[in-house]
Design a protein with these regions (language model features):
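Alpha-helical promoter-recognition and RNA polymerase-docking modules of transcription initiation factors
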Residues: 1-91
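Charged, low-cysteine interdomain linkers and short loop/connector segments
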Residues: 85-103
Length: 103
């Protein structure tokens, strides 16, 4: 099935289409999880977070001539995992030093 068609069907909550998209993009999710696991995060936790970000990104995706689906997914996952990592660091600092940072 063509990528455009898979995206449209996945957005209509068709499980098989979402599964196929997920399978196609699993190498990206794994590479991003591996990158962040090098910063002290658990690989499985990061991969699950990346999977959740992927599903949300599929639902949010709007086709535009200037943005490919793969590029959009990569940016959304990178940004989402960066935010997740920052929250992890904040929590680690608070626990280590007994501090309350921010709100």
């Amino acid at each position: 099935m063509e990528l455009k068609e898979l995206i449209a069907k996945a957005k209509e909550k068709e499980v098989k289409a979402m599964e196929e998209l997920f399978i196609r993009f699993t190498p990206l999710l794994k590479s991003r999880a591996k990158r962040y696991s090098g910063y002290g995060l658990e690989y499985d936790d990061i991969f699950q977070q990346a999977a959740l970000l992927f599903i949300i990104a599929v639902y949010d995706y709007e086709e535009r001539p200037s943005t490919s689906f793969a590029g959009y997914i990569k940016k959304r996952i990178d940004w989402g995992l960066w935010v997740y990592y920052r929250k992890y660091l904040k929590q680690k600092i608070e626990i280590s030093y007994g501090l309350k940072i921010g709100n």
